[in-house]
Amino acid sequence: MIKTKNKKDKWIKLICGASNEDIVAIEDLCAIYTAAGVDYIDVAAEESIVYAAKKGIDWAKKVFKNSPGLMISISDGNDIHFRKAKFDPSKCPPSCPRPCEKVCPTFAIDNFGIKKSKCYGCGRCLNSCPLNLISEYEYNLSKNDLASTLQKIRPNAVEIHTEINRLDSFTKVVSILKSCETKLDKISISCGLNQSFKKAQEPDDLLKALWERYEILNELDIPLIWQLDGRPMSGDLAPTTSRDAVKLFEKIGSDLPPGLIQLAGGTNEKTHELLNSNNLPDGIAFGSAARKIMQPLIEFAHINNKKLYEYPEIMGLAIKKAQKFLEPWKSSSFK
């Protein structure tokens, strides 16, 4: 039987990006947010990326003694979290104002196209091109490679990205998790409402899907996290983007299966203002918003071929920015 909710089990998660391969930036991000006090860090299921994340965590552990759990993201099918953008730069007219370059939050676009390692699939560039030259492609770990990857990486936790209508595929992924016998502290199930379907999905559809997945996971005896993905990978960094996650939590939070509840998908520094202090989730996950405020500092270090933590003053500034960003979730009302 899966353990039920422990009211003291509150946490903050940093999302580095399920398709983010920017190893140098990931090392810096993990160092910064480990120092700032996050409880989990979620990265792509790739050995070199996990190695970079651990290097950043280890640096901060020596100085700040915090030790977040390491989570990897996997998917049971095609998913917007597992994509990248591409275009042929030879087709760009010389006179183009390059709106794609201006909207990219990770500076992945230049005159040579899109740097694969820096693109995490946010989608902001897809509709910015006046000639519609930019397309997306899938970047995902195959089910055939999942077991061996888990055994090599040995993460503390796994997050399975799923969609309402993918129960069979979800079942196969869980079967692989069972077979590889990797010891996990938690399993997170990330799902939201996919409005690209011909028939709009409703919160009750999501609730039914999560209970179906609970029945499949119930025999594993591993604590579960239900991640309500409000506005997944919208590419929108406006303060109001967190409303969808909060509304979803208010609608179905009390009826979810046993486990812990986490908000994601558009979460940012304003999310706490939208929540009722008497009805808070167990966890909060930050992706684009947490990375965006660090990107200029990280880019400065990388231009000079250094890690950000090799600049003590700038690293100190980055940690203070991260602490301020996380401050509402570190307060007694949340923790």
Segment roles from a protein language model:
Residues 16-21, 25-27, 38-39, 45, ...:
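Conserved mixed alpha/beta catalytic, RNA-binding, or beta-rich assembly cores of soluble enzyme
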Residues 33, 53, 158:
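Conserved, mostly hydrophobic/aromatic
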Residues 9-25, 74-94, 117, 133-143, ...:
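Active-site mouth loops of central-metabolism enzymes
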Residues 27, 46-64:
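Glycine-rich, positively charged N-terminal anion/phosphate-binding segment
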Residues 6-8, 62-69, 182-184, 218-222:
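Short helix-terminating capping/connector loops at secondary-structure junctions
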